[in-house]
Swiss-Prot record:
The keyword Hydrolase applies. It comes from Crocosphaera subtropica (strain ATCC 51142 / BH68) (Cyanothece sp. (strain ATCC 51142)). Belongs to the UPF0758 family. This is UPF0758 protein cce_2495. Zn(2+) binds at residues 184, 186, 197. Keywords: Hydrolase, Metal-binding, Metalloprotease, Protease, Zinc. It comes from the Bacteria. GO terms for molecular function: metal ion binding; metallopeptidase activity.
């Protein structure tokens, strides 16, 4: 499929920039957002910027994965292998992708109150959300649930990470925390807890009862999504925390 229509040939109300101003970025197609970044078109068939955006998505789709999944981690040279994409266009796209990651991953300031799973996710996204290997991390809180700090405890493979509950308990005491949230990522993006996740959470809840420091939640992060095991399971009813 080719796209010969130029942006100048499109009615002004239907051009990507004008549409973004009129209806907002979230209502634009992915190819339109790419067109705004590209600025101009070209490539085989002298494609318009929108056409080149479609062409990029088609080329990335050949990998049998979601094009946006590939785009998130693509290199400049991989982008430049697509006809019509030179260094200027490639670096503009990659800079926009990285900026999007950073705005999503913004960390709360130290001493911010972590009063919801979403606040904890914000504190951990930089370390966990987009990683290609499983990371297990902890969020340490004071008695008012204010953030003391975060720490990645272990790094595993693409499908698992091994965690010793005793190490979690030691680190919690070392940090002088009054409450704890643990979290890990699923690189697949499927944040449904596995049986191993549930078993580990049960062990941690039992152990935290013994050291009298509450485990507030166990979060699973991945591909922009998250799951709170406190909300999704009955484990906290079975093993109440102080």
């Amino acid at each position: 499929m080719t796209y010969h229509l130029r942006i100048a040939d499109i009615p002004s109300s239907e051009r990507p920039r004008e549409r973004l101003m009129a209806v907002g970025a979230k209502n634009l197609a992915t190819a339109e957002l790419l067109a705004i970044l590209l600025g101009t078109g070209q490539g085989k068939g002298k494609l318009s910027a929108v056409g080149l955006g479609h062409h990029i998505l088609q080329e990335l789709s050949k990998h049998r994965r979601d094009p946006l999944d590939i785009l998130r981690d693509i290199s400049p040279h991989e982008l430049m292998s697509i006809d019509g994409i030179g260094p200027a266009k490639a670096t503009t796209i990659i800079a926009a992708v990285e900026l999007g990651k950073r705005t999503f991953q913004v960390r709360p300031l130290e001493r911010v109150t972590i009063d919801s799973p979403e606040a904890a996710v914000a504190a951990l996204s930089h370390d966990l959300m987009w990683e290609r290997r499983e990371h297990f991390a902890a969020v340490f809180l004071d008695s008012k649930y204010r953030l003391l700090g975060t720490k990645v405890i272990t790094i595993g493979t693409a499908t698992e990470t091994l965690v010793d509950p005793a190490e979690i308990f030691r680190e919690t005491l070392k940090q002088g925390a009054n409450a704890l949230i643990v979290a890990h990522n699923h690189p697949s993006g499927n944040v449904e807890p596995s049986q191993q996740d549930l078993d580990l959470t049960e062990q941690l809840l039992k152990g935290m009862q013994l050291i009298r420091i509450p485990l507030i939640d166990h979060l699973i992060l991945g591909e922009g999504n998250h799951c709170s095991l406190h909300r999704a399971t009955d484990l906290w009813q079975r093993y109440p925390q102080e």
